[in-house]
A protein has these predicted regions:
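Active-site proximal loop and beta-alpha junction motif in alpha/beta enzyme cores
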Residues: 1-148
Length: 148
């Protein structure tokens, strides 16, 4: 999506909710690896593809309520790792811990998917071309005029 994040799988929804980042350390990590931040997620849920939390303190965003670019990237990550399939309509729940629950939607289409084995018998994923769409509803949180 053009904005790199560290994708961080978490075992359970309870573990995701317990995350309490060390924001200065996370800023240093983000700077070191030249990423926007960390996109923590779990597939341990029945109401969505994933529940997620996004942290980007390097950019003065301790936690983000809705992150389309990161969930678009998570869609592809899930596709590469087998928990999202071509043609899936995905639902990502984010912002709950901030009392600003958001639902981000994505859809993935792919062509040229071939799975096989290498000469060593290891799994090989040759995922060719993908198209990912991301969207959702929005609400106005603030309005105003800026005079220059």
């Amino acid at each position: 999506t053009g904005l790199p994040d560290i994708m961080m799988p978490v075992a359970s929804l309870a573990d995701l909710e317990k995350i309490s980042p060390d924001f200065p350390a996370l800023s240093k990590l983000s700077e070191k690896y030249q990423v926007v931040g960390v996109h923590a997620f779990t597939t341990d849920c029945d109401d969505a593809t994933c529940h997620v939390r996004n942290f980007a303190p390097l950019y003065d965003i301790d936690e983000e309520a809705a992150t389309g670019t990161s969930n678009g990237a998570l869609t592809y990550y899930g596709y590469l790792n087998g928990f999202i399939k071509a043609g899936d309509d995905c639902r990502f729940v984010q912002g709950e811990k901030m009392n600003r629950p958001s639902l981000i939607l994505s859809h993935i289409e792919a062509s040229g998917e071939e799975n096989g084995e290498t000469e060593n018998g290891e799994a090989e994923n040759n995922k060719a071309s993908c198209s990912i769409q991301v969207g959702g509803s929005a609400v106005i949180l603030a309005e105003g005029d800026i005079k220059l």
